[in-house]
């Protein structure tokens, strides 16, 4: 909630500054370069337009229907005055204009549109920004120092979440290091691409794999979990140990069945399942019932930081889409800020005795 308030205050400050310098804005138009954006389908690599929002999900807890986590994090978007587009000259955003041209020509592939969640004007606006962000994320991970920093930060944050649930982290470290080693080995990239493109993932970058495919899909499921999971974890006659044991059994059975259908037994998805078996019991108990209030709030804070980061980086008022270099700088700054916030919160929380 605090992150949402801060995001809104930043937007309001930007609005006031522009009102002073430009003399107001037109509430009735949503234009880019003076041209109203059409709603056009964006093709995927396979040449097909997919309407299903559950396309290629890795989730083990999902129902067939798509459930957005937008409702839980709309506090910074629910005010129409915040969502309205200012009449600043978007033609000055040269890099964004490149993305807009690619999107208008149908050259931006993606697994699912998150235009509404990200606060974009349309699918074309979402695709244009996504085209830019993919290149900025690639710039960040191309830097060895930054890539190592991101790897270590993710390792620390996830391990801390487990520790705050009173869990041993040795098995997690082993599984995490294995998947990082797999991803960093260029020999595996073709295999990884075969696996993920079969699930309609359009790019192997941070947005498509980590944010969209793994985290946001998981948060979608958390918002409206399957009834069977709710029934199990909300049963007051079962102890936490019994709930955890039952959930672990369900996960193991589900993953065993999924592993038999994998394209590669030693591929990316298999490594991801190893992590899932370790992380899911703690997170499921936190979000669906069975954990302490303190741990549930901690996991909710993690979710909020990720979602707020996603909304922020798609906002032209927060991130400079003027050039690849400036977008990369702002994206890295926003990412570093969110990571620092998470690390501070995790380090300040008392570990369970």
Q: Where would I find each of the regions flagged by the language model?
A:
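Extended, low-hydrophobicity acidic Ser/Pro/Thr-rich
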Residues: 2-353
